[in-house]
């Protein structure tokens, strides 16, 4: 009984003391942290108090060692058809096929990264980070896998469409509403804007995308399998949301050998993405038809641009930017002998840049903004990163575009080492006929001469070679004058002996 009477007032005193302390803490706006430690079964507590000045100092110290940058982690996914194509190129060796395909996907990413490294968004650059790859080695694992029920449903739908078309021809009439709908989803038409206006829900902002003029009809799998482009992006989005074991990423790109078909049935569409849905789970994605190497990476960069918030140049909201200027976000990208037009294909117009800057201000795009610890420039690490053309040689670039038997065209009328940087010509090895695509530049880093490689469509000196080779006899190599080296370094045998010396002087040969 006595214990009960004693405990009550003690309890009340404790409550009053805690409440009083809370009020005092609120008034002073000080923050206290309790550090607890257990040693030999005994618990110790240490209260550490911080004032506003202390906290501000901590923030200052934190920020002084940190910097915010734009960074995007990109996952590259290959479908089953892509795997089959590389299996054929690897003579049925599955291990080699997977290895080669991984290198190809990495090369596509590196080329896309190079493109974005050259674009400034205000005072910032968007740094692409390679999140990894995922390859569908079985048909059932493919993100675009179509079940028997879906195939039957599509067959019935196609039959119905053909029936309606025949009826339409018989009646010699036009369905205005259907025509408008077809136009408003097909990237060949300016009225695409109807589905991407700012007052539309994001889920409806789907973009049937980039088209390429005068495309070759055949490539490594002859594009015999087709899929509706809208269905492709929808299936890929659902697939991404269902997967639990994928590498962590903020945008996913599906590389497919399916021929992407627009709603009106043509195959000019080469990619599709949601507009402005960067960072959104599953919706931050794009589907890219694998036309071939440098061209595929350009489409990939284009689609990521849409996801970041860019519209097509020349659209209603971007009317001041002419699509004919051939910038990255043009409706149709084409190859051109004009140097500036070629360079524009790797740049963004002011309209695209401004659209992306505005979209990145949205809270939904916060995943792109990251705090990084300040570090000194590590030039050596950057120098040792392989360029896409080092990962995938020119022969493989031909094979991906046209088939496993194709090699670079050596016909004197087509082949000039330096010209491959802007356009590669290929032949199947059994005929003199050479083929190319309307836009088919070599990957950056593709060899285009002795100690030369392709950068931005130009064949330039490969300074990286200086680090990769050494003179066998440096004393002998250093005794020759520049005029003599100019002559001697043309010899392959001499170059092998004086590799580093000839590499340094390579620009004069």
Swiss-Prot record:
Coiled coil: none
InterPro entries: ADAMTS_CR_2, MetalloPept_cat_dom_sf, MIG-17, Peptidase_M12B, PLAC
Domain of life assignment: Eukaryota
Effect of residue 303 to Q: Probable loss of catalytic activity. No cleavage of the propeptide. Loss of gonadal basement membrane localization in 60 percent of mutants and abnormal DTC migration. Pharynx is elongated
Outcome of substituting residue 292 to E: In k176 and k169; Impaired DTC migration and loss of gonadal basement membrane localization in 20 percent of mutants. Pharynx is elongated
Comment text on domains: The propeptide is required for localization to the gonad basement membrane. The disintegrin domain is required for distal tip cell migration and partially for mig-17 localization to the gonad. Required for the control of pharynx length.
Record protein name field: Metalloprotease mig-17
Classification lineage: Eukaryota, Metazoa, Ecdysozoa, Nematoda, Chromadorea
Gene: mig-17
């Amino acid at each position: 009984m006595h214990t009960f009477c004693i405990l009550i007032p003690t309890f009340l005193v404790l409550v009053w003391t805690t409440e009083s302390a809370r009020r005092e803490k609120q008034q002073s706006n000080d923050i206290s942290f309790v550090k607890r430690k257990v040693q030999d079964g005994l618990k110790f507590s240490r209260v550490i108090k911080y004032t506003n000045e202390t906290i501000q100092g901590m923030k200052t110290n934190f920020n002084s060692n940190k910097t915010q940058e734009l960074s995007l982690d990109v996952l590259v996914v290959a479908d089953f058809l892509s795997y089959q194509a590389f299996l054929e190129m690897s003579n049925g060796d599955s291990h080699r096929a997977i290895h080669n395909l991984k290198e190809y996907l990495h090369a596509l990413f590196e080329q896309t990264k190079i493109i974005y490294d050259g674009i400034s968004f205000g005072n910032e650059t968007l740094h692409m980070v390679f999140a990894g790859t995922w390859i569908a080695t079985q048909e059932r694992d493919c993100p675009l896998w179509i079940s028997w029920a879906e195939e039957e449903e599509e067959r019935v739908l196609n039959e119905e469409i053909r029936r309606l078309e025949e009826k339409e021809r018989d009646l010699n009439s036009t369905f205005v509403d259907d025509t408008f709908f077809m136009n408003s989803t097909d990237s060949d038409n300016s009225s695409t804007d109807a589905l991407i206006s700012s007052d539309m829900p994001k889920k409806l902002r789907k973009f049937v995308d980039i088209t390429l003029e005068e495309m070759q009809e055949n490539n490594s799998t002859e594009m015999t399998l087709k899929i509706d482009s809208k269905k492709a992006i929808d299936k890929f989005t659902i697939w991404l949301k269902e997967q639990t074991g994928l590498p962590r990423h903020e945008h996913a790109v599906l590389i497919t050998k399916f021929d992407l078909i627009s709603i009106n049935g043509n195959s000019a569409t080469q990619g599709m993405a949601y507009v402005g849905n960067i960072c959104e789970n599953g919706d931050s994605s794009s589907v890219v038809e694998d036309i071939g190497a440098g061209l595929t990476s350009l489409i990939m960069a284009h689609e990521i641009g849409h996801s970041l918030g860019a519209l097509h140049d020349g659209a209603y909201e971007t009317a001041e930017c002419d699509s004919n200027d051939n910038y990255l976000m043009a409706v149709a990208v084409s190859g051109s002998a004009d140097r500036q037009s070629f360079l524009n294909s790797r740049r963004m117009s002011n309209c695209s840049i401004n659209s992306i800057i505005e979209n990145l201000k949205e809270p939904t795009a916060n995943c792109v903004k990251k705090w990084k610890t300040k570090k000194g420039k590590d030039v050596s690490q950057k120098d040792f990163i392989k360029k896409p053309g080092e990962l995938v040689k020119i022969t493989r670039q031909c094979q991906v575009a046209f088939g496993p038997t194709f090699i670079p065209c050596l016909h004197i009328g087509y082949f000039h080492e330096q010209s491959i940087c802007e356009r590669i010509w290929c032949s199947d090895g059994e005929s003199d006929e050479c083929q190319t695509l309307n836009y088919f530049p070599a990957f950056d880093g593709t060899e285009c001469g002795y100690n030369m490689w392709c950068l931005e469509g130009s064949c330039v000196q490969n300074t990286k070679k200086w680090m990769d080779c050494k003179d066998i006899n440096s004393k002998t190599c250093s005794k020759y004058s520049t005029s003599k080296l100019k002559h001697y370094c043309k010899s392959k045998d001499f170059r092998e002996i004086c590799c580093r010396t000839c590499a340094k002087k390579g620009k004069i040969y």
